[in-house]
């Protein structure tokens, strides 16, 4: 089992799929990382040699991933809330930010229904 960016990658999966278990790396970026590192994306993670893992580690290290990315996103949201702009207010109230209707939908963002008391 390879460990990259503090994440244990699943050994039985292809490299490009396994890299997606790292927060901040999706399909496109995982394929790009494999290509630049010179690793076949369809190789299973258990079959990687140590130099290949090191090359992947170095390539993933060029991106902001995992805790650093989560922290950056949190800081950006906090900044919006401190500014008091529209998006910040919507974050503060737990409502959708991008103009979706809220009269009937938006249950994911608003959470479970609250009982109406009479």
Curated annotation (Swiss-Prot):
UniProt-listed SUPFAM superfamilies: S13-like H2TH domain
Pfam families assigned to the protein according to its UniProt record, in alphabetical order: Ribosomal_S13
Alphabetical list of Gene3D superfamilies matching this protein: 1.10.8.50, 30s ribosomal protein s13, domain 2 (4.10.910.10)
GO CC terms: cytosol; small ribosomal subunit
Signal sequence extent: none
GO biological process: translation
Source domain of life: Bacteria
Keyword Transmembrane carried by entry: no
GO molecular function, one term: rRNA binding
Region (Disordered): 94-118
Keyword Lyase: no
InterPro entries in UniProt: Rbsml_uS13_C (IPR027437), Ribosomal_uS13 (IPR001892), Ribosomal_uS13-like_H2TH (IPR010979), Ribosomal_uS13_bac-type (IPR019980), Ribosomal_uS13_CS (IPR018269)
Protein keywords: Ribonucleoprotein, Ribosomal protein, RNA-binding, rRNA-binding, tRNA-binding
Assembly and binders: Part of the 30S ribosomal subunit. Forms a loose heterodimer with protein S19. Forms two bridges to the 50S subunit in the 70S ribosome.
Family: Belongs to the universal ribosomal protein uS13 family.
Role summary: Located at the top of the head of the 30S subunit, it contacts several helices of the 16S rRNA. In the 70S ribosome it contacts the 23S rRNA (bridge B1a) and protein L5 of the 50S subunit (bridge B1b), connecting the 2 subunits; these bridges are implicated in subunit movement. Contacts the tRNAs in the A and P-sites.
Listed name of the protein: Small ribosomal subunit protein uS13
Annotated organism of origin: Stenotrophomonas maltophilia (strain R551-3)
Gene name as annotated: rpsM
């Amino acid at each position: 089992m390879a460990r990259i960016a503090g994440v244990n990658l699943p050994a039985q999966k292809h490299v490009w799929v396994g890299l997606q278990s790292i927060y901040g790396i999706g399909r496109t970026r995982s394929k790009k990382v494999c290509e630049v590192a010179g690793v076949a994306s369809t190789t299973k993670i258990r079959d990687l040699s140590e130099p290949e893992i090191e090359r992947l580690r170095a390539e993933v290290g060029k991106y902001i991933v995992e805790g650093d990315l989560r922290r950056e996103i949190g800081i950006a949201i906090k900044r919006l809330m401190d500014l008091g702009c529209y998006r910040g207010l919507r974050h503060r109230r737990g409502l959708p930010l991008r103009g979706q209707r809220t009269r009937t939908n938006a249950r994911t963002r608003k959470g479970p229904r609250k009982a109406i008391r009479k």
